[in-house]
């Protein structure tokens, strides 16, 4: 066949060169995939900036709309929601149409069971080993060594937003153990 004028001969890639390139690409991809979690471990998490919170979700995974939530719940109730890191978190209703400024992580500090609210006794009682917490989540009976973790509960655009609690624990007067 005749070549068109002005087009140089382009040598085709040999089989060995193609296999070397394919092997190099595969090894590189596997190495990068294996290194990603290691590198990601050493990168500190973002501080979250001004919007570092998580919108609370109900049992169906829908955002909690505060006006609707308060209309359907009574004063003194503690209702589970999905909070920071997906942990079950209690939304505390303090007064008429008022949410507490804090939420309670519902994971027991003993062995990680979800602690249900016992309204008749006005406390949280762990079903696994009997730890008890008062209505603010402060441990009152072991074997749990620590109080339930706190989160800030704020309202933004009529949605409930949980943010990390880093201040002094108002129940104990000490630095929070969960930070």
Curated annotation (Swiss-Prot):
Keyword terms, alphabetized? 2Fe-2S, Disulfide bond, Electron transport, Iron, Iron-sulfur, Membrane, Metal-binding, Thylakoid, Translocase, Transmembrane, Transmembrane helix, Transport
Name a biological process GO annotation: photosynthesis
> Does the entry annotate any disulfide bonds, and if so which pairs?
113-128
Cofactor requirement:
[2Fe-2S] cluster
Name the top EC class.
translocase
Tell whether Electron transport is among the UniProt keywords: yes
Question: GO CC: one term?
Answer: plasma membrane-derived thylakoid membrane
This enzyme catalyses: 2 oxidized [plastocyanin] + a plastoquinol + 2 H(+)(in) = 2 reduced [plastocyanin] + a plastoquinone + 4 H(+)(out)
Q: How is the cofactor bound?
A: Binds 1 [2Fe-2S] cluster per subunit.
Function as written in the Swiss-Prot or TrEMBL entry: Component of the cytochrome b6-f complex, which mediates electron transfer between photosystem II (PSII) and photosystem I (PSI), cyclic electron flow around PSI, and state transitions.
Q: What miscellaneous comment appears in this entry? A: The Rieske iron-sulfur protein is a high potential 2Fe-2S protein.
NCBIfam families xref list: Cytb6fFeSPetC, PRK13474.1
What name has this protein been given in UniProt?
Cytochrome b6-f complex iron-sulfur subunit
Q: Can you name the source organism?
A: Trichodesmium erythraeum (strain IMS101)
């Amino acid at each position: 066949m005749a070549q068109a004028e002005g087009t140089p001969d382009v040598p085709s890639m040999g089989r060995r060169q193609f296999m070397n390139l394919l092997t190099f690409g595969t090894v590189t991809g596997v190495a990068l995939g294996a290194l990603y979690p290691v590198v990601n471990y050493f990168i500190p998490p973002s501080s979250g900036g001004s919007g570092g919170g998580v919108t609370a979700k109900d049992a169906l995974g829908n955002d909690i709309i505060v006006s609707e939530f308060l209309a359907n719940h009574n004063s003194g109730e503690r209702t589970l929601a999905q909070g920071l890191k997906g942990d079950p978190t209690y939304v505390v209703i303090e007064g008429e149409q008022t949410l507490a400024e804090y939420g309670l992580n519902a994971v027991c500090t003993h062995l990680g069971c979800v602690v249900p609210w016992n309204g008749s006794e006005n406390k949280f009682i762990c079903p696994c080993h009997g730890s008890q917490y008062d209505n603010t989540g402060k441990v009152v009976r072991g074997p749990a060594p620590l109080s339930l973790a706190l989160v800030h509960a704020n309202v933004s655009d009529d949605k409930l937003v949980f943010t990390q609690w880093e201040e002094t624990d108002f129940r104990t007067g000490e630095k929070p153990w969960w930070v």
